[in-house]
A protein has these predicted regions:
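Generic structural signal for well-ordered beta-strand positions
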Residues: 65-68, 163
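N-terminal targeting signals for export/organelle localization
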Residues: 1-57, 192-193
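Short pre-active-site segment immediately N-terminal to redox-active cysteine/selenocysteine motifs
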Residues: 73-76, 81-84, 149
Length: 193
């Protein structure tokens, strides 16, 4: 009996990890595009969110990325990204081009998710991103926004309502359609970006 209790105790102490199938074995491989996000359509964008601004943007945009500074003025496109995320890499030039084309009508904002600062800065430099990006080193802002996959892009109208969300890599048609929805905002229809 003592030997049996000792064996059970050892299994519990080790966390049963070697007896349980891995997460990959318990779940089928799923493409990020197949995941269903919480429906945030029509919800208000949370107030009070702020992040430390990444260094290249501090001179022009300040020390902190204060989302409230944009509330009630321009629609926003909030892109959550990481340097180690292949779809984030692929969509970066598309987002920059849209920002350059629409910066007088839409505020683009980047949120770097739990990256090493040097890696995030190298990413910004390599893809020459000029819209402001803040760093979410602890993941608290992405938790508040209920982000669970990268990249995730939120589209917020000028009334601070989330009118669109894309989990996974953006294509130009989706970016234009959801940005148009943010611009159209309170009129309840998509506008041409």
């Amino acid at each position: 009996v003592a030997l049996w209790l000792l064996a059970v105790g050892a299994l519990v102490a080790s966390g049963w990890s070697h007896l349980r199938p891995s997460v990959a074995a318990r779940t089928r491989a799923t493409d990020i595009a197949d995941l269903k996000a919480p429906d945030m359509g029509g919800e208000a964008f949370p107030a009070g969110l702020a992040l430390p601004m990444l260094a290249p943007y501090r001179a022009a945009w300040g020390e902190r990325l204060e989302f409230d500074a944009y509330r009630g003025s321009l629609p926003m496109v909030v892109d959550v990204w990481a340097s180690w995320c292949p779809p984030c890499v692929r969509e970066a030039p598309l987002l920059e081009a849209a920002w350059l084309r629409l910066s007088n009508r839409v505020q683009f904002v980047g949120v770097n998710y739990r990256d090493q600062r040097a890696d995030a800065l190298a990413f910004l430099d390599e893809y020459a991103l000029t819209f402001p990006s803040g760093e979410d080193a602890a993941g608290s802002t992405t938790d508040e926004l209920r982000i669970f996959g990268l990249p995730t892009t939120l589209f917020i109208d000028a009334s601070d309502r989330i009118v669109g969300q894309k989990i996974g890599e953006l294509d130009e048609a989706t970016l234009d359609r959801l940005t148009g929805r943010a611009i159209g905002g309170s009129r309840g229809k998509d506008a041409a970006p």
